[in-house]
Amino acid sequence: MAGSWRARGSLVVLAILLFGCLFAISIAKEEATKLGTVIGIDLGTTYSCVGVYKNGHVEIIANDQGNRITPSWVGFTDGERLIGEAAKNQAAVNPERTIFDVKRLIGRKFEDKEVQKDMKLVPYKIVNKDGKPYIQVKIKDGETKVFSPEEISAMILIKMKETAEAFLGKKIKDAVVTVPAYFNDAQRQATKDAGIIAGLNVARIINEPTAAAIAYGLDKKGGEKNILVFDLGGGTFDVSILTIDNGVFEVLSTNGDTHLGGEDFDMRIMEYFIKLIKKKHGKDISKDNRAIGKLRREAERAKRALSSQHQVRVEIESLFDGVDFSEPLTRARFEELNNDFVQKDHGTREEAMEDAGLAKNQIDEIVLVGGSTRIPKVQQLLKDYFDGKEPNKGVNPDEAVAYGAAVQGSILSGEGGEETKDILLLDVAPLTLGIETVGGVMTKLIPRNTVIPTKKSQVFTTYQDQQTTVSIQVFEGERSLTKDCRNLGKFDLTGVPPAPRGTPQIEVTFEVDANGILNVKAEDKGTGKSEKITITNDKGRLSQEEIDRMVQEAEEFAEEDKKVKERIDARNTLETYVYNMKNQVNDKDKLADKLESDEKDKIESAVKDALEWLDDNQSAEKEDYDEKLKEVEAVCNPIITAVYQRSGGAPGGGSGEEDEDSESHDEL
């Protein structure tokens, strides 16, 4: 374990008596004995991705549709729950019951301005429950349920977990999950809770740009390099500047916006066309969820196409009132619509450069991450800023984050072997952490961009005579007054012996772990009495009881999903058998010429009856399909056996050794 220690002491004669000791510990290796295979999951706003380190390299795992990225969408129908492509593909016809962009809600409060803005843009219903945004949706049979953002995120995590399990052929319990570097404490805690609900031990939360840097730098040997990771995804944006030196990845600075990404670009296209439709047709479609769903789908397609074309035509059949929509969109118009977003991205980059203390010519590589970095204007502005320097194209922007997470997983599990044993991550706290002191002042204990894990203690004193309770209010943010920062939580240290103001000594300790999550402790140095919290309910985190309930419900959903799949499989088995029999009795090369007329009549009658039954019983249970299959087999199988026996034990007649193989291949 490598460590660096710094200490300083000072005395402030106002409201605060100050004594500080700061240390940062960098962990090269984790205790890996208790972890199995640790997968890496990029839990994205619009798409998610999963990887695993196996046989000396990272495998990015394709889902059951053959795609290496999975839409972060969840849908509910009267019959089942859908996740991924299946959910996204039915969104236009089922908008109120299809949930997406939940990463923009996780860890936030209902009254946050971003949540209030998003409520107007999504077709599903967001409601206030205990100050948190919950999603209200009809799940089945008219039953309405509210889900926390953590529960919906857990459903996506379960999908990624199952994708990995299908590939690896074993159960997975451990994962590294990535978050935007600029996610605050509440958002990180909520992401960890989502993992618990999904039945995962989240072995580590790591920052997306840091994970992408691993993907870039894993095989890079040689001297020190400064890299800038520009991560513009579907819903969030980060810039991180790192130094890479022979496997040591040290984050120098990070900056970002947890509510800026490709979804915002799509929305600008949609707003443009909504205004155009109103002007041309006198119709406001903004409250028509189906029309908006269709428009959202085509806006995303148009945006993607404009990365390689200068003009696209957006065409939607019967968008509203039977009216077909067809309008051109040029790249120039798209860039104009989103100019303020793109400029904001590059302002964030300049702040990160300033915090890192580097000049433009000291950046050796620019690594692009996230699908939105494919936008030509984004790339052009980066090139212009760095005096014509081309961004590195060697990293897949959709997969780099999951790739790096999988490498980190292999380090934690010990399965990375020689290839990963020398990798060391030194990440940072993205936001300044502190407490409120007299006058609403934000007294900073851990400055932003401090290497984590880290610990800092300061001694405070009382403001009033005979004060017996000290309230500790914890904040994060960069402003000098707490009213302009985010309140993470509050707790009281009681039982302080009455004394004149300035006499008691209350030591407050802030500790940020390797996940970027904060623990706070306050201790009365005179009595030894202490209180501590991992900031919880004050910031809207789920209680342990809520998490336990959600874990139980997630398991129940998984059981229901299993039953739905078994029912579909049973129906498919019956249908396949029946259609196979129908084809066999009508094919001269198979059974048609070998059946007696009464045998053919019996099979055809059984097949006709089964097909009619299937039409009349679309939502039968698995047991019903199994029973029906047995009925049909009871009629058909004895006849098929008799036919084979008449023709010498093999279909098509003849006998002898040369036919033995064909017999085994043609069993019905």
Swiss-Prot record:
Give a single Pfam family match: HSP70
Read off the SUPFAM superfamilies from this record. Actin-like ATPase domain, Heat shock protein 70kD (HSP70), C-terminal subdomain, Heat shock protein 70kD (HSP70), peptide-binding domain
What range does the record give for the signal peptide? 1-28
Keywords on record: Allergen, ATP-binding, Chaperone, Endoplasmic reticulum, Glycoprotein, Hydrolase, Nucleotide-binding, Signal
Where are the glycosylation sites? Answer: 617
Gene Ontology MF term list: ATP binding; ATP hydrolysis activity; ATP-dependent protein folding chaperone
GO biological process terms on file: pollen development; pollen germination; pollen tube growth; protein folding in endoplasmic reticulum
User: What post-translational changes are documented for it?
Assistant: The N-terminus is blocked.
Where is the sequence biased in composition, kind Acidic residues?
A: 656-668
Instruction: Please indicate the residue ranges that the annotation assigns to the motif Prevents secretion from ER.
Output: 665-668
Could you say which EC number(s) this protein's record lists?
A: 3.6.4.10
Q: Specify which residues bind ATP according to the UniProt entry for this protein.
A: 44-47, 103, 234-236, 300-307, 371-374
Annotated InterPro entries: ATPase_NBD, BIP_NBD, Heat_shock_70_CS, HSP70_C_sf, HSP70_peptide-bd_sf, Hsp_70_fam
> Could you tell me what reaction this enzyme catalyses?
ATP + H2O = ADP + phosphate + H(+)
Subcellular locations according to the entry: Endoplasmic reticulum lumen
GO CC list? endoplasmic reticulum lumen
Tissues in which the UniProt entry reports expression: Expressed in pollen and nuts (at protein level).
Stretches for region Nucleotide-binding (NBD): 132-287
The annotated region (Disordered) lies at 644-668
Q: Identify its protein family.
A: Belongs to the heat shock protein 70 family.
Q: What does this protein do?
A: Probably plays a role in facilitating the assembly of multimeric protein complexes inside the ER.
Q: Spell out the protein name for this chain.
A: Endoplasmic reticulum chaperone BiP
Taxonomic source organism: Corylus avellana (European hazel)
